[in-house]
UniProtKB/Swiss-Prot annotation:
Phylogenetic classification of the source organism: Eukaryota, Metazoa, Ecdysozoa, Nematoda, Chromadorea
Keyword Mitochondrion: yes
Designated gene of the protein: SDHD1
Protein name from the UniProt record: Succinate dehydrogenase [ubiquinone] cytochrome b small subunit 1, mitochondrial
InterPro entries: CybS, SQR/QFR_C/D
Keyword Ligase (UniProt): no
Record-listed heme b binding positions: H95
Length: 156
């Protein structure tokens, strides 16, 4: 029960409360002993809570995915077909979505834009991704396809 209560209190409030208590206690002991008050230890503070999710895992997946796209793009020049077109469309859409989502997370925060506009920008990123995927799939189905289009560009 205590751990559930501690998780309900934001980390910043717990750190602030702890540091205020330490400062008050340290001020009286420092006045008596002449020693400096204890310093905040961020490593010990991190051990006190468990994060809800890890951004590092998603970052690693994005980097591995980008590295896997390096041979995929030249392979699309040599291998034609619906499967390669679909694979390329999905890979490009996912890669662009992660890039746009990174920009939205950096610059489209509620602190910067306000709650309403920040929510609209986040929804807009998903709409942009859905339109991109729909457009690429439509191009693959009703036109020459991405692999053939790349070949036609290189023939220019």
């Amino acid at each position: 029960m205590l751990s559930a209560v501690r998780r309900a209190i934001p980390l910043s409030a717990r750190i602030l409360r702890t540091s205020l208590i330490q400062r008050c206690a340290g001020a009286t002991s420092a006045a008596v002993t002449g020693a400096a008050p204890p310093q905040f230890d961020p490593i010990a503070a991190e051990k006190g809570f468990k994060p809800l999710h890890s951004h590092g895992t998603l970052f690693k997946i994005e980097r591995y995915f980008a590295a896997a796209m390096v041979p995929l793009i030249p392979a699309a020049y040599f291998i034609h077909g619906r499967e390669m077109d679909l694979c390329l469309a999905l890979a490009l859409t996912l890669h662009v979505h992660w890039g746009v989502w990174g920009v939205v997370n950096d610059y489209g925060r509620p602190f910067v834009l306000g709650d309403t506009l920040a929510a609209a920008v986040r929804v807009g990123a998903y709409i942009f991704t859905a339109c991109l995927l729909a457009g690429l799939l439509y191009f693959n189905e009703h036109d020459v396809g991405l692999t053939r289009a790349f070949e036609m560009v290189w023939e220019l």
